């Protein structure tokens, strides 16, 4: 990448910057271009990003924020565009840095190399009609791998000349411009130290704090609280106490239609943090009217009362002989002009209330919680609401005193004594997310779901996926079947151990008479930014959407069907799912973890297992093959817990069609199955034995032949077996017949639902272990027969171990 340096026209009306990353409209990529502004003091002055589409009082505007663009804006093409209007700039802003970033998506590789195309485009024009329009290829930078942010370019303003644009091209693994503030400052220093650019901002930066960051939270951002608190640190920092700050602001009231008309009152917004259990039932809540619950409370602690010195109000008395404005001979004074209207910050955080969560003290049954801000005035809704916003703040190590409070003054004084510019701040902002409302656009909105907090259990399907270290769920199910089986069996064993540990803890608690108050299952708390608008006059009116919110993590739209390729679902019985949803059901590649320890990885269609898949059962049995409507159907292989294996055709979950079954005695049974039972001609073989005969519902019935190869001695060395083997024999064949009670093998009649009707007059079919009613008849004496080959070609590949191989020419060969 080679960009500049070159000076942009000083009197230009508009500069445009954009990134292009979509090769086709179908590509589901979520890259964005941000701009970070630094002032002459080297301080971060303002930011522009997807959730803050205007900055510097409209001098920077995101392309999608159409109503904030001046009428004369010349629109440019681009997947994400920033418009800059230099004539609106404040003089204190000296440096702008442009950052391309790809937000991380849990369960999906999503970095700047995920697209086959990545370009940075610049265009401008001046009053003389001079124009510039050029794009620069960023793809070689992203191809390094693991690149989630690129500091693309820097612009700086010098005393002589206009804005100068220069390429940077620094790549970073962090997915947000807010996490690379130290690198942004270093870029400013590099302008001075490496390129000789004289900037006040560079001279003002005395030291760079490697932990400095600003929260840039995107919609549907999903992250564990511990990871968010750690930021760039390698080890997560446990969050034990969380503060949720709430803010909302309003549009100015419309002008009165009649003289003397009182302006309307501000809407009375309320909030509700509803906590749910795994069944979707409300456990408790914190709201405007309900200020306290287990492990949670609303409102800041009462501040200490300041001891104020009593001061007498001094009134100025006019001196003798001085005339007041109404005094005799005095000239009437003009009233002073009204002060200018204060500048309105559209992104002001106006704290309305706070919620404290003592995370370890929350009720164990709480699985998730949803934060909503409501105004159930269905006539006006959110018409007057400008912003609704919340901040998640880690206060595990304490809180910063409120500005202007006695504690803040004392902290500042203590910091000054230590030579610090400001007192240390023990708080960490984990997320700052809000919804911007356009005036009168949201009349139908009466409630906004801002944020979700939820437990992610260690044994979830998502964590099984993460343990594989693959890019996405399609890559997970595309692994070798044996690899998937090992991963699912590891989940099964972990589930068994966890259940045993829970049972032991419950027994110990019962014996000691203590109550288990903590959640016994290992988990982490995560947050997910929502920003979803709903109507209705109560929470009950959006019950369906709320169920989706607390049990589903993926892209959501109010009232719409679930549709996401990286969704996570939890179910009341403890099952979890990670994979694709379409039209509100599981569809596409997915991974399902049963609470029993069973697991499935494969394709779904219409909400059911359908297509190729791998499944591990609670007893350790495994299936690899085809599914239809949640059942085995097509070709597949089932390994039973005892080690035996069936490979062949299935229908409706049963063996049906041609197949091969290897048992634990290293024998091979071949034939045709119907509804799980062997029927018609079948062959069973061992190294020294072959049985060929007719079967009825799994029982031998009809003519048969036993073939015995007496000289195959498995416990003798290979050379000995080869030495004693003759060209043929002694191998004998015995024609015979088996019989079963008449009528016992008839197919049962079925009822309307397809279930067999019990027939008390029908004789029972012989069955294991006694096989009562089964008869055997030798048809004639044994006769010599050719040697047999084992294992049979039709039984290969052999799916079990330690099976010897015999051939006619060489004897025991393995």
Swiss-Prot record:
Disordered, as annotated region: 283-346, 739-769
Modified residues (Asymmetric dimethylarginine): 243, 428
A Gene Ontology term for the protein's cellular component: motile cilium
Lineage: superkingdom: Eukaryota
Keywords of the record: Cell projection, Cilium, Cytoplasm, Cytoskeleton, Flagellum, Methylation, Repeat
Posttranslational mods: Asymmetrically dimethylated at Arg-243 and Arg-428 during flagellum resorption. Probably methylated by PRMT1.
Biased composition (Acidic residues): 303-329, 748-758
Sequence ranges of the MORN repeats: 577-597, 600-622, 623-645, 646-662, 671-685, 691-707
Major subcellular site: cytoplasm
Family matches, as SMART domains: MORN (SM00698)
SUPFAM superfamilies membership: Histone H3 K4-specific methyltransferase SET7/9 N-terminal domain
Entries under InterPro entries matching the protein: MORN
Compartments reported by the entry: Cytoplasm, Cytoskeleton, Flagellum axoneme
Function: Flagellar radial spokes contribute to the regulation of dynein arm activity and thus the pattern of flagellar bending. They consist of a thin stalk, which is attached to the a subfiber of the outer doublet microtubule, and a bulbous head, which is attached to the stalk and appears to interact with the projections from the central pair of microtubules.
Full protein name: Flagellar radial spoke protein 1
Gene behind this protein: RSP1
């Amino acid at each position: 990448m080679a960009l500049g340096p070159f000076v942009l026209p000083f009197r230009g009306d508009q500069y445009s910057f954009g990134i292009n990353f979509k090769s086709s409209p179908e590509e589901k990529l979520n890259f964005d271009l941000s701009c970070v502004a630094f002032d002459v003091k080297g301080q971060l002055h303002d930011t522009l990003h997807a959730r803050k589409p205007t900055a510097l009082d409209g001098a920077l505007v995101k392309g999608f924020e159409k109503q904030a663009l001046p009428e004369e804006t010349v629109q440019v093409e681009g997947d994400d565009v920033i418009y800059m209007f230099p004539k609106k700039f404040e003089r204190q802003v000296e440096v702008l840095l442009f950052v391309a970033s790809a937000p991380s998506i849990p369960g999906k590789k999503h970095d700047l190399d995920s697209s086959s195309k990545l370009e940075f485009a610049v265009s401008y024009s001046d009053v003389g009609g001079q124009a510039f329009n050029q794009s620069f290829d960023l793809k070689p930078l992203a191809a390094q791998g693991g690149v989630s942010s690129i500091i693309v370019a820097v612009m700086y303003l010098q005393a002589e000349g206009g804005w100068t644009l220069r390429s940077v091209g620094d790549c970073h693994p962090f997915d947000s411009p807010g996490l690379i503030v130290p690198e942004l400052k270093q870029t400013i220093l590099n302008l001075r130290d490496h390129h000789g650019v004289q900037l006040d901002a560079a001279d003002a930066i005395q030291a760079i704090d490697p932990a400095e960051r600003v929260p840039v939270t995107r919609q549907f951002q999903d992250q564990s609280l511990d990871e968010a608190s750690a930021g760039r640190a390698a080890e997560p920092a446990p969050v034990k106490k969380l503060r949720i700050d709430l803010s909302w602001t309003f549009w100015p009231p419309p002008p009165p239609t009649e003289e003397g008309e009182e302006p309307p009152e501000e809407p009375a917004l309320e909030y509700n943090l509803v906590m749910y259990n795994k069944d979707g039932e409300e456990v408790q809540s914190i709201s405007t009217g309900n200020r306290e619950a287990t492990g949670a409370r609303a409102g800041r602690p009462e501040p200490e009362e300041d001891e104020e010195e009593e001061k007498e109000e001094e009134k100025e008395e006019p001196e003798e002989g001085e005339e007041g404005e109404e005094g005799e001979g005095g000239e009437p004074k003009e009233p002073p002009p009204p002060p200018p209207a204060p500048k309105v910050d559209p992104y002001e955080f106006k704290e309305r209330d706070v919620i404290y969560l003592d995370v370890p003290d929350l009720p164990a049954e709480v699985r998730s919680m949803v934060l909503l801000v409501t105004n159930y005035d269905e006539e006006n809704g959110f018409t007057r609401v400008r912003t609704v916003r919340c901040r998640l703040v880690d206060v595990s190590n304490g809180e910063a005193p409120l500005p202007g409070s006695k504690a803040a003054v004392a902290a500042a004084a203590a910091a000054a004594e230590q030579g610090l510019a400001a007192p240390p701040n023990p708080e960490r902002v984990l997320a700052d997310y809000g919804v911007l409302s356009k005036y009168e656009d949201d009349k139908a909105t009466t409630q906004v779901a801002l944020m979700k907090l939820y437990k992610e259990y260690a044994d979830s399907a998502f964590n099984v996926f993460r343990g594989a270290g693959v890019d996405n769920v399609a890559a997970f199910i595309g692994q070798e079947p044996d690899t998937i089986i090992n991963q699912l069996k590891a989940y099964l064993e972990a589930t068994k151990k966890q259940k045993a540990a829970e049972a032991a803890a419950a027994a110990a608690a019962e014996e000691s008479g203590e109550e288990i108050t903590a959640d016994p299952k290992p988990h982490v708390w995560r947050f997910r930014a929502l920003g979803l608008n709903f109507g209705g006059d109560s929470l009950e009116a959006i019950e369906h959407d709320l169920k989706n919110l607390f049990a589903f993590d993926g892209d959501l739209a109010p009232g719409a069907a679930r549709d996401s390729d990286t969704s996570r679902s939890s179910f009341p019985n403890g099952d979890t799912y990670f994979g694709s949803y379409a039209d509100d059901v599981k569809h596409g590649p997915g991974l399902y973890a049963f609470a029993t320890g069973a697991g499935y990885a494969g394709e779904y269609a219409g909400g059911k297992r359908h297509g190729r898949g791998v499944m591990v059962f609670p007893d350790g049995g495994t299936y690899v093959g085809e599914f239809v409507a949640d059942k085995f159907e097509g070709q597949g292989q089932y390994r039973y817990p005892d080690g035996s294996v069936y490979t062949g055709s299935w229908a409706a979950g049963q063996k049906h069609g041609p197949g091969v079954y290897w048992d634990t005695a290293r024998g091979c049974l071949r034939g045709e199955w119907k509804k799980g039972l062997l029927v018609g001609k079948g062959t069973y073989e061992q190294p020294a034995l072959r049985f060929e005969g007719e079967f009825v519902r799994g029982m031998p019935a009809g003519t048969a032949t036993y073939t015995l190869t007496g000289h195959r001695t498995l416990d003798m060395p290979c050379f000995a077996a080869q030495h004693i083997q003759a060209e043929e024999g002694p191998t004998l064949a015995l024609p015979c017949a088996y019989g079963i009670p008449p009528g016992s093998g008839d197919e049962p009649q079925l009822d309307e639902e397809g279930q067999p009707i019990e027939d008390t007059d029908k004789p029972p079919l012989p069955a294991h272990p006694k096989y009562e009613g089964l008869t055997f008849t030798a048809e004639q004496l044994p006769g010599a027969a050719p040697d047999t080959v084992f294992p049979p070609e039709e039984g290969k590949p052999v799916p079990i171990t330690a099976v010897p191989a015999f051939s006619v020419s060489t004897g025991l060969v393995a």
